[in-house]
From Swiss-Prot:
Its cofactor is Zn(2+). Its EC number is 3.1.-.-. It is found in: Cytoplasm. GO terms for cellular component: cytoplasm. Single strand-specific metallo-endoribonuclease involved in late-stage 70S ribosome quality control and in maturation of the 3' terminus of the 16S rRNA. GO terms for biological process: rRNA processing. InterPro entries: MetalPrtase_cat_dom_sf_prd, YbeY, YbeY_CS. SUPFAM superfamilies: Metalloproteases ('zincins'), catalytic domain. It comes from the Bacteria. Zn(2+) binds at residues 118, 122, 128. Binds 1 zinc ion. This is Endoribonuclease YbeY. Belongs to the endoribonuclease YbeY family.
Amino acid sequence: MTAIIDVQQAFEGEEVISIDIPSPAELELWANAVLKYEGLSDQEVTIRFTDEAESQSLNSEYRGKHKPTNVLSFPFEAPPGIEINLLGDLVICAPVISREAEEQDKQVSDHYAHMTVHGLLHLMGYDHIDDAEAEEMEGKEIDILAQLGIDNPYDADE
């Protein structure tokens, strides 16, 4: 199984936040861990890194929430009869990830890994709307991150 990652960086103005953005190799490592865990074959995903303005605009348009968020997922739905290994798109807000990592006393790279895994699971149909769904999804995140040598991101929440 291989993840094919199309990375986009979309920043306006003079923001210098790309320094924290994971490398394509890191993104592929994290995505491949998710694919392996879920038993999926080759999949393609676009990961777009944005500023807060774009994140807030998309979050408002698609979720009715008028603030930037860490990650948004847009699953690809192929027309009936069309087979394509395209999971969809992730939109990751770099300033939110950096801020959350600092607030939660986490390594920025670990938080990027967590939000990438989280977003990919959303693309695969997992959600956390109710407690049972959240428990299942968080369990998968914890397992996948552990395989990557990353501590349980929810430990601070418990």
